[in-house]
C-alpha cells in the first residue's frame, strides 16, 4: 500500500503580525496628522507671552503721519513715501479674515483686544509715559460754568454699555447640543402643558354656565340696548307756539265767516283741487326742520 502523507498547514504568524503592525502604524500616523491639523486650527486662548515680550511694533509710517513734511526735524521731504503711505492700509482693510468678519456680524466681543489695551495703558502708567492730552487741562472761564450741566440732568451711558457687554458675552458662549432625548422631552412637556391649559379652559366654561344666566347674554344685551340709543339722524322739530288770542276792544265786531258752498254745487272747469299742492308744501316745510 502506498504511504499517504498527511498535509499540515504551516503557521503564518510572522507575516500576519507584520501586516497588522503596518496597518496600526498607518492608522497612528493618520491620527497624528489630523491632531496636528486640529491644533493648528485652534485659536489660542488669552494673550500669548511672546506677543507681550516683543511689544508693540512701531512702524515707520507713524513718524510720517506725525510729521509728514518734517517741520520739526527738518530735511528733505520724500514725496514717494507721502504718496504710498495710504496704500498698505487699504490692502489691510480689504484682506478681511473669517474670524474678524464673523465676530463683527454676530456682535461678538474680542476679549484679547481689550486685555492688550489694558496691559498697554498699565505699562505706560508704570513707565511714566502719559499722553499729553490727559495732562492738558484747560483753565475754565466764568462763562464755561454756564454751559456745565448739573449731575441730576446728565444722561449716564453706563447702563447701555453694561447691557451691550452682557449681550456680547452671551453671544460669545458656544452652543451645546443636548441630543435628541432632550428635544423629545421638551416636546412632550409642551404638549402636556397645552392639554392642561385646554382642560382648564373647558372646566371654567362649564362652571360659569348656570340656569339663571343665559348663554347668549351678549345677544340679549344688544337686542334690548337698541331701545336706549338716541336717534342720531332724527329730524329736529321746533315746537310751534299757538297763536295768542287778540284782546277785544270797544267797537270790534266779529268778522263774517266765508260763505260755504253747498256740497252739490257745480265747480267751474278752471277750478281744481288744491289738496296735492298743500300736501307737497307741507312736506317741504317739514324737510327744512
Curated annotation (Swiss-Prot):
Subcellular location as annotated: Nucleus; Chromosome, Centromere
Molecular function via GO: U5 snRNA binding
Biased composition (Basic and acidic residues): 232-283
UniProt-annotated stretches for the region Disordered: 1-27, 232-289
Keyword Phosphoprotein: yes
Keywords annotated in UniProt: Centromere, Chromosome, Chromosome partition, mRNA processing, mRNA splicing, Nucleus, Phosphoprotein, RNA-binding, Spliceosome
Entry-annotated residues carrying Phosphoserine: 15, 17, 261
Family: Belongs to the TLS1 family.
Record's protein name: Splicing factor C9orf78
Organism: Homo sapiens
